[in-house]
Structure formats: C-alpha cells, structure tokens
C-alpha cells in the first residue's frame, strides 16, 4: 500500500480511514508539503500579475523613464498594460453539427 493513499473502509457508523491516525514521519511530511504546495499554487493564480511584474522589475515600478517625453511614456504604459491584460476577444467559438 502506498504511503500517500488512504483506504476507506465502511463501518457501521461512518466511513473511516485506516491511516488517519498514522504518526509515520513520511506521511506527516508529505501532508505538510502537499498543503504548502496547494497554498502557493492558489496565491500564484490570484496574484500572478503582481508577482511576475515584481520579479521582472524588482522593487521598482518599472524601467526608468527619465528624459523620455511624456507622449512616449504614455505609449509605453499602454503597451505594457496591453501585454499584461488578458484579451477575451481571441477565443474561438466552435459549433458542432
């Protein structure tokens, strides 16, 4: 039997797991790693725009715009925003007959 699977057996009152009371360190470590992985995955999906911008530019808000005319700054901001935003217009509708 695998250490990471639980076998459920019917009893008179309810379902119970055979390894639910296990104190095996490997089972405990696998459970902790699984829970941490799930939490990190959820946070990544919720905040992926912020996280990847922070990794790309560090603690700065973006590349320096010193000496760049305001019109070019605005154009650059629009390009960056459009690159990050999800475009819903690219979905394809397929009709089955």
From Swiss-Prot:
Taxonomic superkingdom: Viruses
Any one GO MF annotation of this record: proton transmembrane transporter activity
Site (Seems to be involved in pH gating): 41
Main subcellular localisation: virion
UniProt note on regulation of activity: The M2 protein from most influenza A strains is inhibited by amantadine and rimantadine, resulting in viral uncoating incapacity. Emergence of amantadine-resistant variants is usually rapid.
Keywords: Disulfide bond, Host cell membrane, Host membrane, Host-virus interaction, Hydrogen ion transport, Inhibition of host autophagy by virus, Ion channel, Ion transport, Lipoprotein, Membrane, Palmitate, Phosphoprotein, Signal-anchor, Transmembrane, Transmembrane helix, Transport, Viral ion channel, Virion
Membrane side Virion surface: residue ranges: 1-22
GO BP term, pick one: symbiont-mediated suppression of host autophagy
Lipidation feature positions (S-palmitoyl cysteine): 50
Intravirion side: 44-97
One matching Pfam family: Flu_M2
Feature type site, description Essential for channel activity, possibly by being protonated during channel activation, and by forming the channel gate and the selective filter: 37
Location of this chain's protein in the cell: Virion membrane; Host apical cell membrane
Sequence intervals crossing the membrane: 23-43
Region listing for Disordered, in residue ranges: 60-80
Record note on domains: Cytoplasmic tail plays an important role in virion assembly and morphogenesis.
Additional detail: When the channel is activated, one or more imidazole moieties of His-37 probably become bi-protonated.
Assembly behavior: Homotetramer; composed of two disulfide-linked dimers held together by non-covalent interactions. May interact with matrix protein 1.
Family affiliation: Belongs to the influenza viruses matrix protein M2 family.
Protein name: Matrix protein 2
Organism: Influenza A virus (strain A/Chicken/Hong Kong/YU562/2001 H5N1 genotype B)
Lineage of the species this protein comes from: Viruses, Riboviria, Orthornavirae, Negarnaviricota, Polyploviricotina
Chain's gene name: M
